Amino acid sequence: MSDPKVTTQRNPSIVILDFGSQYSELIARRIRETEVYSMVLGYNSSVEELKKLSPQGIILSGGPSSVYEEKAPLCDPSIWDLDIPILGVCYGMQVMVKQLGGLVGEAIGKAEYGKALLQVDDPTALLTNVENGSTMWMSHGDSVKQLPAGFVRLAHTTNTPDAAIACHDRRFYGVQFHPEVVHSTDGMVIIRNFVHNICRSKPDWTTNTFIDEAINDVQEKVGKKRVLLALSGGVDSSTLAFLLKKAIGNQLTCMFIDQGFMRKGEPEFLMEFFDKKFHINVEYINARDRFLDKLQGVSDPEKKRKIIGTEFIRVFEEESLRLGPFDYLAQGTLYPDVIESSGTNIDPKTGERIAVKIKSHHNVGGLPKDLQFKLVEPLRTLFKDEVRKVGRSLGLPEEIVNRHPFPGPGLAIRILGEVTKEKLNCLRDADLIVREEIADAGLYHQIWQAFAVLLPVRSVGVMGDQRTYAWPIVLRCVSSEDGMTADWSRLPNSLLEKISNRIVNEVNGVNRVVLDITSKPPGTIEWE
């Protein structure tokens, strides 16, 4: 296999081999929380590839397959001769058992999903300082029937006799549960034991270390040449702008394309902040009318997205040629995009890797190849929470660092149906009220996203003894850790009342406010 290369010059201390688990990225994030650099690779990475990285330890992730099936994904058998510690998690533990001569079968009547109490039989090595009876998160329908030679039991649960195992001599360990998830109360204790105590990895993956290494990488790659960055004002592109400014100074040009779908006051704030306050060269492109003209009569959300994306590319191409020439295009690619582009998802029926389409932000994905840019992507080794830490260390204000996620097409996909100037003005005013009141209540940083949605229907109302026929506004507030799943936020009734009263009294064209109480799944956070 060939996984995308990262820009950092360092090798990972810990490599996670991904067997298709939904938690593989989370394992890497948890390891990095202990200040140790980790990397996710495909399960079928060769021993030769691993040797080039010289990891101090390997973790085998969970996965949807069963190891006893004909085409079950397994790792390179030579991995067991590398003489480094290996930890198998859930399916990864079963891979370890099978490849080393043990037996795994279906856990008939003994499957475990959800929380289980871990009874510690051997409180040493991997389970040092793990509390007996602590809660661990289970998610398995198979179980170990016979341990390989040299292995011993470390812990059990009511339904799982071998919940944790070890071959101490070879430093091989396995857990049938998921220590990386928040539901496993002593999960981080186990991860630290493996990473720090067993693998002896040094805690040298810090924000300042990354910044220093990234600046050196950019300077070596770019030299004295010019770099163009499409600036959106989100935390990724803002952090990247600050990092590049520190690395190459005036060789950086940022292009801010105002497509007319940003929140109230944001274009002015961004220009004041980046261009005037921090003296980062930002070229402001006012393309509001151009984008709005393209969306006339368009109601389908996917068509709106495609039109906005296509038009962005055209504007970007025209303006880059006008402002250029540029040698490099800077992109805010993050590590989850790198992982996804490597296609490590596994088909449980065939055991084969599933090709996954790379997620592309609408404002950079699909840029014309004849622009002939070379890419510079210094954030591609980072997770989102790490980007925020870097941004904060570089001097980004909290209002950008902790900004709620905002979709690339902006308010255009928070207006259901056709987008018009009147609707945009209405939604901007309503959205500002939502954000102001939630911030005043001290709840902004406790909520993942809070915003308003304008519906393409009108409802009857009464205001000042007069009949009204106006748009309803939907209030959407959700709580989440990563946006993959979300629950609707239980805001105080007094706050909901205040938001509703302000919107119907201060926003022209609105006479009703409704609350979206749908979780994700089954709904999505955005309405379009």
Swiss-Prot record:
Q: Where is the GMPS ATP-PPase domain?
A: 205-403
Catalytic residues (positions): 90 (nucleophile), 178, 180
InterPro entries in UniProt: Class_I_gatase-like, GATASE, GMP_synth_C, GMP_synth_GATase, GMP_synthase, GMPS_ATP_PPase_dom, NAD/GMP_synthase, Rossmann-like_a/b/a_fold
Would you say which domain of life the source belongs to?
Answer: Bacteria
Q: Could you give a GO molecular-function term held by this entry?
A: ATP binding
> Part of which pathway?
Purine metabolism; GMP biosynthesis; GMP from XMP (L-Gln route): step 1/1
Provide this UniProt record's keywords sorted from A to Z.
ATP-binding, Glutamine amidotransferase, GMP biosynthesis, Ligase, Nucleotide-binding, Purine biosynthesis
> Which intervals hold domain Glutamine amidotransferase type-1?
13-204
Catalytically driven reaction(s)? XMP + L-glutamine + ATP + H2O = GMP + L-glutamate + AMP + diphosphate + 2 H(+)
Write out the residues that bind ATP: 232-238
- Its top-level enzyme class, in one word, is ligase
EC number(s) on record?
6.3.5.2
What's in the GO CC field?
cytosol
Reply yes or no: does the keyword Cytoplasm apply.
no
A Pfam match: GATase
Under the subunit heading, UniProt states: Homodimer.
Functional summary from the UniProt entry: Catalyzes the synthesis of GMP from XMP.
Know the name of this protein?
GMP synthase [glutamine-hydrolyzing]
Say which species the protein is native to.
Answer: Prochlorococcus marinus (strain SARG / CCMP1375 / SS120)
Higher taxonomy? Bacteria, Bacillati, Cyanobacteriota, Cyanophyceae, Synechococcales
